[in-house]
C-alpha cells in the first residue's frame, strides 16, 4: 500500500560445494519500535540541552562547550573568546508589561543572535536574562567589532505591545581566553566586564583581554 517502515537488512551469500557464490539471502527486520525509541531518546537529549523558551543552547550545553573549547585550545591552539550578555532593565519589562512580554523580549533577543551568528559561533541562554556567546576569534579588534555589532543589532530590534514599539538593548562583557585561564576565571572576567558596561550606562560593551 506504499506505507514505509524503517528496517534493518542482513545479507548472506550462498555458495555451492566448490565455494563459488551462486546467490544471496537478505533478511529484512522491522525496526519501527527501535526507531521510535531512538527518536524519543534524541528528543530527550535535545530537551536537556536546549532552552525551551528561546530555543538556544542552555547553560548545561554551554558548560560542555566551554570544556570542549578549552580542550581544543590545549591540543590545537584554537583561540576563542566569550561575550557575557545581559538584557538591560529586563525586570522593568516584566513589572510594567507582564511576564508574557518579558518572554517575548527574551525570544526577540535570541532570534537576533540566531539570525546574525556565524556558523562556528555559539550563543546560548546562561540563565534569566543572561546569555553567553562562545566565539571562534583570534584578536581583540575582531572581538570588539563583533560585540558592538551584536549590541547594535539588538538595539535595532523591537517588539510591539498594544501598538507601542518596545526597544530592547543589551550590555556586554567581552574577553579572549588567556593561556593561564580556567573556565571560572574566564567567566568571572567576562562578568566583571559586563558589570562595567552596566555601570557606565548600559547599551554598550566593555572589552578586556
Label every PLM stretch briefly.
Residues 144, 162, 176-209:
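Catalytic-core segments of nucleotide cyclases and related cyclic-nucleotide turnover enzymes
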Residues 20-31:
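PAS-family sensory domains
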